[in-house]
Swiss-Prot record:
The lineage of its organism: Bacteria, Pseudomonadati, Pseudomonadota, Gammaproteobacteria, Pseudomonadales. GO terms for molecular function: 2 iron, 2 sulfur cluster binding; carbazole 1,9a-dioxygenase [NAD(P)H] activity; metal ion binding. Residues 29-135 form the Rieske domain. InterPro entries: Cholesterol_7-desaturase, Homotrim_ring_OHase_catalytic, Rieske_2Fe-2S, Rieske_2Fe-2S_sf. One of its GO terms (biological process) is carbazole catabolic process. Homotrimer. Carbazole 1,9a-dioxygenase complex consists of a terminal oxygenase component CarAa, a ferredoxin reductase component CarAd and a ferredoxin component CarAc. Keywords: 2Fe-2S, Dioxygenase, Iron, Iron-sulfur, Metal-binding, NAD, NADP, Oxidoreductase, Plasmid. It comes from Metapseudomonas resinovorans (Pseudomonas resinovorans). This is Carbazole 1,9a-dioxygenase, terminal oxygenase component CarAa. The keyword Membrane does not apply.
Length: 384
């Protein structure tokens, strides 16, 4: 059953599956927290694509269970009871499940029940990489993590640091905010632009051939699917904003050139290279929590050759790049997403919006996501 009214989906030309993906795409890896945020034997709760989950670290390894007892449907997290380190017991009737595989291994209140060994709670694969915790919300064996991460993120020398926060907008509004070529106008007064001496136009006018504004990648060696925004290369940067021929605003004429290489990848992760400095990259995920909220999983990467360089980068990240870039710059993006919420809340915004020439990158992303996603999350998955 569709997540969006069929009448609306029929009016969408070219990317109806994307419009239907209010809850995100199933069968993909998603980052949900940083490794340092989950300690041994201290289960964490979270919601991903509408599903309530529990994550626990046992002997260093992470496991993920669906946070709902099979007996009467209550959330195990209401009162977490782990009588042994390898199991979790429901606080209501003492059904007990193994973290490793979700099997109902015991019932404390009825140890001879025929249900023991016959029932199994849904589990999801978990993998840690670059200090981040990824969950594969899907069915069957997961693909390599590289398929769902941007190029360079997993490079051996790439040191990744970041922050994660919950934003009150649908994940698609976040993706399109990040990948929107002309949204840079909202950053014109950012502290990062001034204090880091960045060159930043007000926007871009498209060149002669709009087909050159994007490049689609659907044959990556590890299976990645993505779109490159090339308007910076094939368009005309606009540094003077005029009304009636009169210049009313100018862009920033800084010395540092950044954001030459911008791309978006399934299941919804942006790569900006270089950014926020010529020797760094930004990788940010827009992870669906439910139809109304998403995790804004922001990371900055910098190649580091040794421990000393990593330590220096950590200090620089906390003192400079986190407050100046991830907050001072990206906070503009957050309120822009939230400002779009009302227009798209009833899904009619997807057919009532009026796009213009520089939205070619957004159109290419919508088409790619519609064609190459690995499955649309539905309420049936959430309740199943």
């Amino acid at each position: 059953m569709a997540n969006v009214d069929e009448a609306i989906l029929k009016r969408v030309k070219g990317w109806a599956p994307y419009v239907d993906a209010k809850l995100g795409f199933r069968n993909h890896w998603y980052p949900v927290m940083f490794s340092k945020e989950i300690d041994e034997g201290e289960p964490k709760t979270l919601k991903l694509l509408g599903e309530n989950l529990l994550v626990n670290r046992i002997d260093g390894k992470l496991y993920c269970l669906k946070d709902r007892c099979l007996h009467r449907g209550v959330q195990l997290s209401v009162k977490v009871e782990c009588k042994t380190k390898s199991t979790i017991t429901c606080w209501y009737h003492a059904w007990t499940y193994r973290w490793e595989d979700g099997v109902l291994c015991d019932i404390l209140t009825n140890p001879t029940s025929a249900q023991i060994g016959r029932q199994k709670l849904k589990t999801y694969p978990v993998q840690e990489a670059k200090g981040c915790v990824f969950i594969y919300l899907g069915d069957g064996d997961p693909p390599p993590l590289a398929r769902d991460t941007p190029p360079n993120f997993l490079d051996d020398d790439m040191e990744i640091l970041g922050k994660n926060q919950i934003i009150k907008s649908n994940w698609r509004l976040a993706v399109e905010n990040g990948f929107d070529p002309s949204h840079i106008y909202i950053h014109k007064d950012s502290i990062l632009v001034k204090d880091n001496d960045l060159a930043l136009p007000l926007g871009f006018a498209p060149g002669g051939d709009r087909k050159q504004q994007t490049r689609v990648v659907d044959d990556d060696v590890v299976g990645r699917k993505g779109v490159y925004d090339l308007i910076g290369e094939h368009g005309v940067p606009v540094f003077e904003g005029t009304i009636g021929g009169e210049v009313v605003r100018e862009g920033a004429y800084g010395e540092k050139i950044v954001a030459n290489d911008i791309s978006i990848w399934l299941p919804g992760v942006l790569k900006v290279n270089p950014f926020p400095n010529p020797d760094m990259m930004q990788f940010e995920w827009y992870v669906p929590i439910d139809e109304n909220t998403h995790y804004y999983f922001q990371t900055l990467g910098k190649p580091c050759a040794n421990d000393e360089e990593r330590k220096n980068y950590e200090q620089e990240f906390e003192s400079k790049w986190k407050p100046m870039a991830l907050e001072g710059f990206n906070n503009d993006d957050i309120w822009a997403r939230e400002a779009m919420v009302d227009f798209y809340a009833d899904d009619k915004g997807w057919v009532n919006e009026i796009l213009f020439e520089v939205d070619e990158a957004i159109v290419a992303w919508r088409k790619l996501a519609s064609e190459h996603n690995q499955g649309i999350q539905t309420q049936a998955h959430v309740s199943g």
